């Protein structure tokens, strides 16, 4: 509920973060809807204390799918960016699970037209084709298309530090002005008795 969100905002602000995700790729304020709240009002109230503290807010965007798990018409996605900007969202973090730049390109345009910062993601995985050169070239292509920031999106938490370091170094060598963020979804589980015993 929005009253709960507003209560935890000061604690998040006190952490000293510079940005906070306010709309994830799977929810779109579904919890607010379940409680009978207007999600547009909820997002505005949720982002207000962060903006007052100088903290930017993010939204997650699945490229051609928007916030859904299936494609969204272009005119709807274009309007969506304008609505999110009006709600107080500063940055859009766009990703395509296929790492297809063609799917991300329209989001860059829509974000910039709406006055938002376009942050584009490299979805990290391991295969013979997903090399340091592959990700470097993808980042450079996204920047050429107008991306303001690059996100190293390590959703499975499998990124190898040496490889990630090389990717970042390559991007910075070509574009030192481009901010690069690392985003990981790490799930920790308690060790099993077998792990503890070492057997």
Predicted regions and their residues:
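Catalytic domains of carbohydrate-active enzymes, especially glycoside hydrolases
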Residues: 7-24
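Non-catalytic positions within long, well-ordered alpha-helices that form the structural scaffold/packing
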Residues: 13-14, 85, 143
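Short, well-ordered coil/turn segments that N-cap beta-strands
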Residues: 17-19, 51-57, 89-90, 114-116, ...
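Active-site beta->alpha loop and helix N-cap motifs at the rims of alpha/beta catalytic domains
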Residues: 25-106, 117, 122-136
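Catalytic core of soluble alpha/beta enzymes
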Residues: 137-175, 179, 187-190
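Single conserved hydrophobic/aromatic residue that forms the stacking wall/gate
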Residues: 188-199
